């Protein structure tokens, strides 16, 4: 995905305010061996780009005024407190030979044909909507698919139940290497978990 940028030499709060009044957005590109690059973006262009999922989870081609192109990854966006206005954007340079640490969205499919929904009338709870991963830039997926087609009422799907793309590894947090991804919650019941069996045992 491509977007346009213009290098800027003037920095500081007052300069940033002037840019915003002119319909521009201050931004920065950092990482790699080159020095950080201060840039400005057209507000309307970046606003609409940020509404697209792929802009958040893809290698982006930044075209700097004059024709130079750099591959970057979106890192953070600062929004106005109450207006739909982009205040600042951070991008990171991409090195084809260095692994990326980023987050990618999960796409859930086939929920409507699963036994959980068709037979049990369950509500599918998406416990996670994205995964924290590491991979080389060339292997970065735009999303990871989670097939719910075989999910039963009261059942659940963990990370071990889905197949990660080749070359992609999950970054565990807090020692949880197999987090809960989705659960089929049945009205008046719930999703099955490891504590259910223990709870049903009579007291000694």
Swiss-Prot record:
Part of the 50S ribosomal subunit; part of the 5S rRNA/L5/L18/L25 subcomplex. Contacts the 5S rRNA. Binds to the 5S rRNA independently of L5 and L18. One of its GO terms (biological process) is translation. The lineage of its organism: Bacteria, Pseudomonadati, Pseudomonadota, Betaproteobacteria, Burkholderiales. Belongs to the bacterial ribosomal protein bL25 family. CTC subfamily. One of its GO terms (cellular component) is cytosolic large ribosomal subunit. Keywords: Ribonucleoprotein, Ribosomal protein, RNA-binding, rRNA-binding. The keyword Ribonucleoprotein applies. CDD domains: Ribosomal_L25_TL5_CTC. GO terms for molecular function: 5S rRNA binding; structural constituent of ribosome. Pfam families: Ribosomal_L25p, Ribosomal_TL5_C. This is Large ribosomal subunit protein bL25. The gene is rplY. This is one of the proteins that binds to the 5S RNA in the ribosome where it forms part of the central protuberance. The keyword Glycosyltransferase does not apply.
């Amino acid at each position: 995905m491509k977007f346009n940028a213009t290098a800027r030499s003037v920095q500081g709060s007052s300069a940033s305010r002037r840019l915003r009044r002119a319909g521009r957005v201050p931004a920065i590109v950092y990482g790699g061996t080159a020095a950080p690059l201060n840039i400005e973006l057209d507000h309307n262009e970046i606003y609409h780009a940020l509404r697209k999922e792929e802009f958040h989870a893809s290698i982006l081609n930044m075209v700097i005024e004059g024709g130079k192109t750099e591959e970057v990854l979106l890192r953070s966006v600062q929004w106005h407190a109450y207006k739909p206005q982009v205040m600042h954007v951070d991008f990171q340079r991409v090195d084809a030979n260095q692994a990326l640490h980023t987050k990618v969205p999960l796409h859930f499919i086939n929920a409507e044909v699963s036994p959980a929904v068709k037979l049990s009338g369950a509500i599918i709870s998406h416990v996670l909507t994205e995964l924290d991963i590491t991979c080389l830039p060339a292997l970065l997926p735009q999303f990871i698919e989670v097939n719910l087609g075989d999910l039963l009422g009261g059942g659940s799907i963990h990370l071990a139940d889905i197949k990660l793309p080749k070359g992609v590894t999950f970054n565990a947090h807090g020692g949880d290497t197999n987090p809960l991804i989705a659960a089929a919650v049945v009205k008046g019941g719930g999703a099955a978990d490891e504590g259910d069996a223990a709870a049903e045992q009579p007291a000694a």
